[in-house]
Amino acid sequence: MVKGYEVVIGLETHAELNTESKIYCDCKNQFGLEVNSQVCPICMGMPGTLPTLNEKVVDYAIRMGHALNCEINRVCKQDRKNYFYPDLPKAYQISQAEVPLCGKGYVDILVDGEERRIGITRIHIEEDAGKLLHSDKFHGVSLVDLNRCGVPLIEIVSEPDMRSSQEAKVYLETLKSILQYLGICDCKMQEGSIRCDVNVSVHKPGEPFGTRSEMKNVNSFSAAVRGIDYEVERQIAVLEAGGKVEQETRRWDDEKGMSIPMRSKEDAQDYRYFPEPDLLTIVVEQERVDELKKSIPELPNVKILRYVKKFGLNIKDATFIAESVSLAKLFDDCMAKDKFPAKCYTTWILGDLVKYMNATGKTLEDTKLTADNLTALVAAIEAKTISNAGGKKVFAVLLEEDKKVSDIIEEQGLAQVSDDSALEKIADEVLAANEKSVNDYKGGKTNALGYLVGQCMKASKGKANPGKMKEIILAKLG
């Protein structure tokens, strides 16, 4: 509820599928190649060419449908969506209108610790358009890169079930993690491989839904939050002023922090959909549908609940780990060894590892860290072989070099001194050299103990076992 108005949000999420070739031709499906280098007569829309559907696209879409609990339409067709734009050489896009590959479904998300179910209207397959290039060096004209033409997409259309920008963000993050878990989309928003259109309306409680506006050019999840919040405020201001919200398509300008009108919102009839005459009806055998369902891994929302219930993680930590394929695998591999509590691993994963990745821009795959090495490091710390400070030094090496924990400890001389006689000798020397602190402690100044332990650690060059060192000093102080 915002200023007495209920907010209604629906999202249309486009995900580029990471197949090797495009959806209707053999051109390479790869980002960042030379302009117009991955094109052919089919994806350029030349007269007389005939498309051939990439079977892998159907498989990927069905897997996403299973992940979102969708009905799978084993018999469906493809349609032409007619509109003119410079980056669409055929002047139509091959999509699905009446019967999508995946029908009704849902996804459960956690918002502030509470479970919310968001309905899925449909998932359909379609081809991407090209990309317009704008630059001052083009002397007042725009050029077209058709490399993206024919890149396979799935469009995931939600029900208008979200009631806040935060819910929308969590929904998008959940979709992203599922796509990555399935391995069907890399979800690199900076490359446009996942993007969304946002539909927003507001209404007074008890009244019918208001007129919605669609917002495009939303290129990050944080931009989606800002865009939704702005659009809600804009629509409320229009209604409070006695105006009428128009059904229109708007463009989000993240730099200006505002949405800008583009055109009146089209209805399906404006696109003059009709069946694609150059492609056969899609018929998927039930056996294949069942096989694809079996290939679905444990999904992040399921992992979150398992991490909370089985390992005692809080929701924030569980969500952070579960939504990253690589971090979740590292954590699960460590816990599978069943040696130490989860906290021993999450301290390193959510602390030093994430800090390193944020500072360097690297992913876990870019490091040399393995579950075996992390478990060995935790074992060394738990056995008091090295201190926590020494552990940080070892961890830093594990990130950069393929070495054993034991070798790093030996090379850097990080092994703690735990021999009682050696520690007692250090304690005797420190106590003799710090008579005032000894008297202070005996006189009731307990903070003097910390100073004495610190001096012992300094004398041992950090190698003394601090726990044992403290015990020995206490025994000697009486």
Predicted regions and their residues:
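Amphipathic alpha-helical core segments of compact helical bundles
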Residues: 18, 233, 328, 350-358, ...
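Basic, nucleic-acid-interacting segments
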Residues: 1-298, 315, 337-341, 351
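Structural motif
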Residues: 3, 312, 336-345, 385-386, ...
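Short, amphipathic C-terminal "tail helix"
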Residues: 446-478
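Strongly charged, low-complexity linkers/loops
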Residues: 364-375, 379, 388-458
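Extended, non-catalytic structural segments that build the interaction scaffolds
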Residues: 288-295, 302, 332-340, 374-386
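Extended hydrophobic-aromatic, low-complexity segments
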Residues: 282-283, 318, 330-332, 344-345, ...
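Core structural elements
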Residues: 191-204, 309-332, 342-360, 372-374, ...
